[in-house]
């Protein structure tokens, strides 16, 4: 039998398309410590209207994760919270949160996802550990 008669549902494409559609329809909010609900999900940060970081809140809540990012940015030079907005979607399932983060990163290729912005790497800041590009561009105050 030829492949033209076979049906294969491409779940990842359908999931990504629906997630991005819902995500882009969600409102943008100023990045503050209380912007999001205490639920799990996915989010993106925008600087001056440009999507710069996509992440997930799984072991913590969207509220805590976005508050952590707001505090980090507020404590840096060359950037301010006035420049920042965010979008988020609440998602209950661990699998869908992980898949959602992957879909956002793959779809948007955010610059800060490659610079160490959201890093929780053990040893960061210790002697002998190189500073991330993000820490170099936006040093602590």
Stretch-by-stretch model annotation:
Residues 1-52, 56-141:
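Boundary/linker segments flanking structured domains
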């Amino acid at each position: 039998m030829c492949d033209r008669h076979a049906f294969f549902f491409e779940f990842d494409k359908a999931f990504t398309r629906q997630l991005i559609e819902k995500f882009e329809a969600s409102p943008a909010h100023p990045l503050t410590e209380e912007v999001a609900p205490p639920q799990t999900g996915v989010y993106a940060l925008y600087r001056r209207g440009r999507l710069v970081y996509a992440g997930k809140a799984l072991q913590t809540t969207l509220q805590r994760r976005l508050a952590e990012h707001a505090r980090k940015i507020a404590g840096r030079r060359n950037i301010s919270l006035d420049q920042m907005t965010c979008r988020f979607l609440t998602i209950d399932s661990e699998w869908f949160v992980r898949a959602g983060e992957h879909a956002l990163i793959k779809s948007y290729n955010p610059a800060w996802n490659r610079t160490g912005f959201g890093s929780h790497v053990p040893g960061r800041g210790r002697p002998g550990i190189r500073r991330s590009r993000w820490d170099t561009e936006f040093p602590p105050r």
